[in-house]
Amino acid sequence: MTATWEKKEGNEGLLKVTVPAEKVDKALDQAFKKVVKQINVPGFRKGKVPRPIFEQRFGVEALYQDAVDILLPEAYGEAIDETGINPVAQPEINVTQIEKGKDFEFEATVTVEPEVQLGDYKGLEIEKQDSELTDEDLQEAIDHSLGHLADMVVKEDGAVENGDTVNIDFDGYVDGEQFEGGQADGYDLEIGSGSFIPGFEDQLVGVKTGEEKDVVVTFPEEYHAEELAGKKATFKTKVNEIKYKEVPELDDEIANELDSDANSVDEYKENLRKRLSEQKAEEAENVEKEEAINKATDNATIDIPQAMIDTELDRMVQEFGQRIQQQGLDLQTYFQISGQDESQLREQMKDDAEQRIKTNLTLSAIADKENIEANDEDIDKELEKMSKQFNISVEDIKNTLGNTDIIKNDVRIQKVIDLLRDNAKYVESTKEDK
């Protein structure tokens, strides 16, 4: 077999392939064995028609399409390997010759992976992230954990304060008329949660149990119900009950309840500090890595073919469908609720799809340029890491994956990201202190 590759405009080219006549004859034999089983010829049992009789009656041409179907997949795959091209979409095939006793010839118009013109990827200016855990961070985490153990206690006297949970009845009016979805009885609302229209919760601060108040708010311009967007509304509201959180004091018993490995408050704080420090350091590292990736990608120039974008959008729509399925919805139901269709969803995802592709191509191109590869030791380490993380044996992971190509590529790309970060120039954060 011979194959030639001729680059055309953009990311397309013409692949010309010639398969020897001997293989054509073998494919015709296979095609005959398949087709003859379906043929009825008077004087012969089904499937027992001799080849010469078949060709005399139907012509050898009747076998050509089946022979092409047999020859094409293998020949196309071998041609890709021989020419070293990397297709990103299904080719357009044009058979130029298929005939008994002659070579099989075809042309394939192929869209290939685009060339990447790398820009600067070393010495990138990256903002240094604060990875130090402060005493304030630790106390905030402790307070948050204690909050989960808090009891809700009815406030017998006093007014609504921020952080309280109020039970309310409300009746909403726009232009003096009630509107759909604007009424409720016995609704529990945490003040300060931001779950209601801006301004609603603030106006309940200071109100006492049993009191009524007209809460006046304006719906946001981008409110999901278009008929209410930007309009002023009055909610006649009654406070039925006020509850506040009674947070327990941190002692040795509570410390052990929050962390079974801690037998005292000091041990709990020490364990928590260590865990939070590791978490904050990891978060800081991830932010720095993301900035390095984005800058290296922005500095690269790539003409992404539409076929790659379409394929990535197919993948993203599928991923989105799987996520909403976990929430009990399917895509069609989502489209009905949102008023969107798939074409609109794909248009919303288009920029992200292009960025994903550009990022992957850029990192892969850097790996090629820097001769970065994942060796067996790297792969074994990653498998051990996955085994501990998911509590699955290495053998089970290998059996599930089938091969380690995905892990090999992931490790390779991670090495590229480490290279970007290790060679970056770090500058102090310009953000104001929190």
Swiss-Prot record:
Pfam families: FKBP_C (PF00254), Trigger_C (PF05698), Trigger_N (PF05697). It is found in: Cytoplasm. It catalyses: [protein]-peptidylproline (omega=180) = [protein]-peptidylproline (omega=0). Keywords: Cell cycle, Cell division, Chaperone, Cytoplasm, Isomerase, Rotamase. The keyword Cell division applies. GO terms for biological process: 'de novo' cotranslational protein folding; cell division; chaperone-mediated protein folding; protein transport; protein unfolding. Residues 163-248 form the PPIase FKBP-type domain. One of its GO terms (molecular function) is peptidyl-prolyl cis-trans isomerase activity. GO terms for cellular component: cytoplasm. It is an enzyme of class 5 (isomerase). Coiled coil: none annotated. Its EC number is 5.2.1.8. InterPro entries: PPIase_dom_sf (IPR046357), PPIase_FKBP_dom (IPR001179), Trig_fac (IPR005215), Trigger_fac_C (IPR008880), Trigger_fac_C_sf (IPR037041), Trigger_fac_ribosome-bd_bac (IPR008881), Trigger_fac_ribosome-bd_sf (IPR036611), Trigger_fact/SurA_dom_sf (IPR027304). PANTHER family: TRIGGER FACTOR CHAPERONE AND PEPTIDYL-PROLYL CIS/TRANS ISOMERASE, TRIGGER FACTOR-LIKE PROTEIN TIG, CHLOROPLASTIC. Involved in protein export. Acts as a chaperone by maintaining the newly synthesized protein in an open conformation. Functions as a peptidyl-prolyl cis-trans isomerase. HAMAP family: Trigger_factor_Tig. Belongs to the FKBP-type PPIase family. Tig subfamily. Consists of 3 domains; the N-terminus binds the ribosome, the middle domain has PPIase activity, while the C-terminus has intrinsic chaperone activity on its own. This is Trigger factor. It comes from Staphylococcus haemolyticus (strain JCSC1435).
